[in-house]
């Protein structure tokens, strides 16, 4: 039997928690490899991933800030910080998995005739990024990552509210020893 209802529990298990279930997926970045310690003068590899939402992805960025550099309270999303672009890693070369020849069937939407994405990274996918931090002096740092979407909007905007999809700017601590 088919039951028609407008009872909110039918499709909204978060209704009582005041979540916005109609928000589009946001573009955001998270760390994957984040070293806790390193030595002064040594390059520091840092990697992460991006979730590509409805706004697409223009770039992933990283920022390293000395812990004793107190950031102004009137810039809670670090819009004036000296962010550096990370490298978005290329898409996989084989998308077909266990399909014959490891190839996608013809005419898969958003893929070209060679089985590669027409645009990378694609919306509603995950992609990886990497960067190498160089020339870091001895000290303690906060390292943050964020995304910029195809509209030029930086994470966590345009909707920084937790109930509309959590996409805070992630941070980790890095100690650089002498």
Q: What is each model feature region?
A:
Residues 1-178:
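Extended, aromatic/histidine-rich regions of cofactor-dependent oxidoreductases associated
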